[in-house]
């Protein structure tokens, strides 16, 4: 019998209470990993951890707000207290600020960066000691919005371009320590991202703004992501439409710009 791909590994996942984060947790656990789940909504984490344990996996739920200094370090302390050291850190937590530039305030941009950029930094800095000692992996969940910036999502795109740059820089710095850095850039994945407002508050009844035929399930996306992580790939654009958009913008940006001029500004239609 083949050994599960991540057997014996411990994986820290931020933003694990829903969407891509929860799907990654289930898939890592199914492939033999111990998962440390971090997010603000502890009750959801505990329910997910219980689900994973019932299925025969190992999971630790930790309340964490990545915008608060010291919170990611406390998660690492909780993991150590449970006898766990982090092999793979997945900086997944994030949300999207949407709106035309003239309608947004500096505070909106600061709020966006505090979670999507500085939250990623806090997460990686907290886990890096373990990951480096175990020659593990750093995984950053970016977006196709880190490859192409459209009207109406300047703040979100700026944050995703920033973490894409971080991934490229870290890869060169950590290579000599045997640490891989994988940047995942999803397209439209079914998640709660588009139910979160510009202040980072979740609205359960907010409508989905992406047509169903464009959405890929979080479970399917997670399986693709795990293959990239297991192979220690540099970067993986997830979803077929995501790869197409990135490719066409790289080779024919004029075509994308022409289509954008015909349409409306993007409003919550983000990864």
Regions found by a protein language model. Name each.
Residues 175-240:
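SDR active-site lid
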Residues 33-48:
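Conserved glycine-rich Rossmann-like NAD(P)H-binding loop of the short-chain dehydrogenase/reductase
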Residues 10, 17-18:
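Conserved glycine-rich cofactor-binding loop
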């Amino acid at each position: 019998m083949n050994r599960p791909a991540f057997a014996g590994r411990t994986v820290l996942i931020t933003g694990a209470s829903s969407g891509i984060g929860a799907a990654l947790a289930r898939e890592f656990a199914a492939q033999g990993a111990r998962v440390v789940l971090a997010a603000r909504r502890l009750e959801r984490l505990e329910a997910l951890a219980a689900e994973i344990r019932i299925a025969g996996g190992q999971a630790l739920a930790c309340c964490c707000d990545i915008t608060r200094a010291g919170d990611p370090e406390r998660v690492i302390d909780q993991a150590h207290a449970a006898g766990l050291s982090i092999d793979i850190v997945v900086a997944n937590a994030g949300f999207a600020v949407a709106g035309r530039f003239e309608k947004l305030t500096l505070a909106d941009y600061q709020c966006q960066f505090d979670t999507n950029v500085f939250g990623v930094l806090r997460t990686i800095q907290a886990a890096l000691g373990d990951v480096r000692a175990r020659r593990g992996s750093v995984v950053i969940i970016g977006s196709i919005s880190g490859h192409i910036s459209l009207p109406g999502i300047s703040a979100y795109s700026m944050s995703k371009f920033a973490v894409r740059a971080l991934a490229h820089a870290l890869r060169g710095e950590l290579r000599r320590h045997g640490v891989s850095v994988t940047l995942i850039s999803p397209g439209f994945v079914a998640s709660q991202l588009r139910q979160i407002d510009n202040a980072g508050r979740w609205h359960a009844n907010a409508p989905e703004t992406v047509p169903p035929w464009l959405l890929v399930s979080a479970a399917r996306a997670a399986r693709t992501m795990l293959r990239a992580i297991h192979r220690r790939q540099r970067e993986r654009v997830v979803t077929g439409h995501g790869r197409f958009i990135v490719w066409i913008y790289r080779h024919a940006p004029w075509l994308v710009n022409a289509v954008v001029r015909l349409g409306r500004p993007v409003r919550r239609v983000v990864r």
